A protein has these predicted regions:
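Non-heme Fe(II)/2-oxoglutarate
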Residues: 1-53, 70-73
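Hydrophobic, well-structured mid-protein blocks that either form specific transmembrane helices
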Residues: 49-50, 54-62, 85
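Beta-sandwich strand segments
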Residues: 50, 153-154
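Catalytic core of non-heme Fe(II) oxygenases with the double-stranded beta-helix
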Residues: 61-141, 151, 158-159
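Active-site-flanking beta-strand signature of metal-NTP-handling nucleotidyl enzymes
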Residues: 84, 164-165
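Double-stranded beta-helix
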Residues: 166-170
Length: 170
C-alpha cells in the first residue's frame, strides 16, 4: 500500500527540530515520488484542463508534528506554497464522532483531535468549515492558502504523529 511505504520511509528520518532530512537515497526518492503523485492527482481533481504533472512539482519543505494531549496547532496557512500535504503516520486517538449525530454543524459537535479547514465567510445557512478526524495512513492535500487548525485532544496517553510539507509548481 503506497501510504504504508511513505510512512515507513519517512518516519525515522527526523532531525532534532522535527524537520525531515531528505537524503539522496532510493527510499527517500520513492517516498517523495509517492507524495508528488498524490498532489498531482489532487490538482487533476480540481481542474481537468489545467492540472500539474509530477514533473511540475517541487518540494519546498517538510516537517514532522508530534502531538500529545492538550496541544493545539493554531489557525494558520501555508501561503508561501501552492499546495500543502499531511500524512498521518500514527494516531492512537479514539474518534470523537463515533455515535454522534451531527446537527447543522453545531458548535457542540465534537472536535477533539480533528483538523479543520476554513473557507469563505461565516453566513447563515452557509457552512464555511470542514472537519476531518484523521486516521493512520490518511494522506490529505489542500491549497496552501487554505486556513486550517488542529484541535487539541484530551485523551491522556494518546499521541498523533504526522508528516507535513509544502509543494510548489515549477
Amino acid at each position: 500500500d503506497s501510504q504504508e511505504s511513505v510512512k515507513d520511509k519517512l518516519c525515522h528520518t527526523t532531525s532534532m527540530n522535527n524537520r525531515l532530512e531528505f537524503q539522496e537515497v532510493p527510499a527517500h526518492f520513492d517516498a517523495l515520488a509517492e507524495i508528488f503523485q498524490h498532489v498531482s492527482k489532487y490538482t487533476r481533481s480540481l481542474n481537468t484542463c489545467d492540472w500539474r504533472e509530477v514533473e511540475d512539482l517541487t518540494l519546498d519543505n517538510v516537517w514532522m508534528n508530534v502531538q500529545h494531549a492538550n496541544q493545539p496547532i493554531g489557525h494558520h496557512t501555508h501561503e508561501e506554497a501552492n499546495y500543502a500535504f499531511v500524512i498521518y503516520v500514527r494516531n492512537t486517538l479514539t474518534d470523537p464522532t463515533i455515535g454522534h449525530t451531527y446537527e447543522d454543524r453545531s458548535v457542540n459537535d465534537p472536535v477533539d483531535g480533528m483538523i479543520e479547514w476554513r473557507y469563505g465567510e461565516t453566513h447563515y445557512l452557509s457552512p464555511n468549515r470542514m472537519l476531518h478526524f484523521p486516521e493512520e495512513r490518511d494522506i490529505v492535500v489542500f491549497p496552501g492558502w487554505l486556513e486550517h487548525q488542529v484541535y487539541p485532544f484530551k485523551q491522556e496517553g494518546a499521541d498523533r504523529i504526522s508528516v507535513a510539507g509544502n509543494i510548489n509548481t515549477i
